[in-house]
Amino acid sequence: MAAAVLNPGFFLLILLLSFSISPSLQYVSESEPLVRFKNSVKITKGDLNSWREGTDPCSGKWFGIYCQKGLTVSGIHVTRLGLSGTITVDDLKDLPNLKTIRLDNNLLSGPLPHFFKLRGLKSLMLSNNSFSGEIRDDFFKDMSKLKRLFLDHNKFEGSIPSSITQLPQLEELHMQSNNLTGEIPPEFGSMKNLKVLDLSTNSLDGIVPQSIADKKNLAVNLTENEYLCGPVVDVGCENIELNDPQEGQPPSKPSSSVPETSNKAAINAIMVSISLLLLFFIIVGVIKRRNKKKNPDFRMLANNRENDVVEVRISESSSTTAKRSTDSSRKRGGHSDDGSTKKGVSNIGKGGNGGGGGALGGGMGDIIMVNTDKGSFGLPDLMKAAAEVLGNGSLGSAYKAVMTTGLSVVVKRIRDMNQLAREPFDVEMRRFGKLRHPNILTPLAYHYRREEKLVVSEYMPKSSLLYVLHGDRGIYHSELTWATRLKIIQGVAHGMKFLHEEFASYDLPHGNLKSSNVLLSETYEPLISDYAFLPLLQPSNASQALFAFKTPEFAQTQQVSHKSDVYCLGIIILEILTGKFPSQYLNNGKGGTDIVQWVQSSVAEQKEEELIDPEIVNNTESMRQMVELLRVGAACIASNPDERLDMREAVRRIEQVKT
């Protein structure tokens, strides 16, 4: 019997049918383990109702799920939902391409679940839960692809598992704020890819391995481990008693060879010293109070850690000019508390020498208004304001002052313009005061003296992007959603485009763009500050104070340009998207993340998704937009400025990104 001849088209039909059927089968197979995972835990602060069996987890509708190329589940990011119960890791083994698990800020407890069964994991983030107990020493031996491990702010006990030090690709390890004991494995110092090691706030003991201290490009935090000594922690080991582990004694702790009688004598001496010190402060307080009564016309606005002080000395009016200025200050409510007629003289400097002076009403000692959108005020109004130190920046110190009218302002004392003549300073300040753009912080006023320059601007209650992104872990930080971060990036881009048009003739229209100079309004609208200062600074001061001088081109050619501002914009874009503090902001480059190298290498390997801050990843569609924006940031930080986007093109591409 002749064999039947099959039409080749039949095989093609079978092949096409298999392709058309396989995606739906993939959806079903991946939705089932996710639904089982959802059913195994309790949710107290939200829901996962979008997780429905038989639907496509990669449709963009499943909360907290993101997918690789929109086809297969690669990440589970379920945070702040009050999850509790038992995680069955076996359910997740049916997700073959799962790379990231993020369950931080929940209520999960008990021993660490058996995540070692998921050998393909690259990121495991379990911060801020209540996991407890010891972690098996060999727990991580099969997780060779793991890059980021966050176990911080839990209740883990025992020693650090040695298998962690055998993870060849590990870049970040966070185990701070647990109850870990024992010594730090020296093998951390030989882990080639390790960039961040945070073991702070534990009960670790012994000598910090020299290999960790010697490792370059490693950000280490070992603070609040009482019994550690040696390098990194800067605690000598002379007073550390290393116990014989065979004796079963507790971990090594500081010991003392001083007899008990000597201790009692020392305590008595300390008590006597404290009593004398208290008596001294009482005497000083009495003297100060008497001096205040004799000299009520001297007030200190603020001081900082470097003993810089902001002082305002009020002297009796003694000239016709002073009389006129006093009259004008009375109209503004600027007379002194005791009803006497005063004139304002700024005295801002180290040690409060009390020198210098000039009449109000436009004289050397007055506040010059350049923007009256928030009303007018004078130096006496600032003098009567409650003031506090905000901090020190690369250009000087900043102080917050709340005036009696309720207006809160920031007074920035700029230390690197002391040799600047009055005329160029006046011209620039008045020009700044005319700027109007929703993303530019326009100064309200300024004060000129040969020795001191002050710039007054409106206070932003949400502070800077730097603080909200890295320093605050409260409500402000939690509100930095993907939509909010995109709004900030686009606002910064619009502001920079405006500055590059307004100051097109300047080498650096901004020159100092970084997250500390991006302030946030109540609605998270970004306002750019500290711009266009280059013409006002001495070249030597500018190269030290302005961030644009940390660009690759300045290091290579000692030149800066408009493209240097583009580089700074790229750093901010990447900082916002990754949530990482850039090491580029630090003078010594130690600490933070080398965000340029990290991004460039990941983009080259087409691993952009791994760079995105897990806190803002919700679905596949938003991930696509984030990656697109990240590529714009990467195009802004090319080492060769000729290969960077120009500002106009960068802004155009940023505007195209939608939430």
Curated annotation (Swiss-Prot):
Membrane topology, as annotated: Single-pass type I membrane protein
Q: What is the effect of changing Y227A?
A: Normal interaction with LURE1.2
Q: Which residues span the membrane?
A: 267-287
Residue runs in coiled coils: none
Keywords (alphabetical) are: ATP-binding, Cell membrane, Disulfide bond, Glycoprotein, Kinase, Leucine-rich repeat, Membrane, Nucleotide-binding, Phosphoprotein, Receptor, Repeat, Serine/threonine-protein kinase, Signal, Transferase, Transmembrane, Transmembrane helix
Please list the residue ranges that the record marks as compositionally biased, kind Basic and acidic residues: 324-341
SUPFAM superfamilies per record: L domain-like (SSF52058), Protein kinase-like (PK-like) (SSF56112)
The disulfide bonds in this chain are C58-C67, C229-C237
| Residue positions, PTM Phosphothreonine | T484, T557
Q: Where in the cell is it found?
A: Cell membrane; Cytoplasmic granule
Question: Where, by tissue, is this protein expressed?
Answer: Expressed specifically in the pollen tube, predominantly at the tip.
Q: Which InterPro entries match?
A: Kinase-like_dom_sf (IPR011009), Leu-rich_rpt (IPR001611), Leu-rich_rpt_typical-subtyp (IPR003591), LRR_dom_sf (IPR032675), LRR_N_plant-typ (IPR013210), PRK1-6/SRF4-like (IPR046959), Prot_kinase_dom (IPR000719), Ser-Thr/Tyr_kinase_cat_dom (IPR001245)
Give the record's GO CC terms.
Answer: cytoplasm; plasma membrane; pollen tube tip
GO MF annotations in UniProt: ATP binding; identical protein binding; protein serine/threonine kinase activity
Q: Specify the superkingdom.
A: Eukaryota
Record bears the keyword S-adenosyl-L-methionine: no
Instruction: Return the protein name.
Output: Pollen receptor-like kinase 6
Give the organism the record lists: Arabidopsis thaliana
